[in-house]
A protein has these predicted regions:
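STAS-like cytosolic regulatory interaction modules
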Residues: 1-35, 42, 54-116
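Residues at alpha-helix caps and immediate loop-helix transition turns in enzyme cores, especially N-
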Residues: 16, 48-49
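Acidic, metal-coordinating catalytic cores used for nucleic-acid/nucleotide bond scission
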Residues: 40-48
Length: 116
């Protein structure tokens, strides 16, 4: 089990996600299931969940992700935020390759517009 609060204090930012990903990857590399204990974590964003956790839906596929990952001790806000991220990841995974390329192009253009 990975006690998330041993590595980060919030589940909020890209930095939080970047700090947790190597811990998750190490667990996956041992072919173990990933149990993430969020006790003590109070702040959550979909940005965090997208980049730290539900990205594995895209690499493993929804069924394998469901077998491998378990999140425990999430607050109600944390659970709702995670479920939103998970739903989006599952929907994105189901897109055909052509639709996925179009979505990636739209996202890229939107990011460029927002950053300039």
């Amino acid at each position: 089990m990975i006690k998330v609060s041993n590595y980060i204090q919030t589940a909020f930012s890209m930095e939080d996600a970047a700090a947790l990903v190597p811990i998750i990857d190490a667990k996956l590399n041992t072919n173990s299931n990933v149990v993430l204990d969020f006790s003590g974590i109070k702040f959550f964003t979909t940005l965090f969940f997208n980049n730290a956790i539900t990205k594995y839906v895209l690499s493993l596929g929804p069924e394998e992700y469901k077998k491998k990952f378990k999140l425990i001790n999430l607050s109600e806000v944390g659970r709702t935020t995670y479920e939103h991220s998970l739903t989006n990841a599952n929907s994105y995974y189901e897109l055909s390759d052509d639709k996925r390329k179009i979505e990636e192009m739209i996202i890229s253009e939107t990011l460029e517009d927002n950053l300039n």
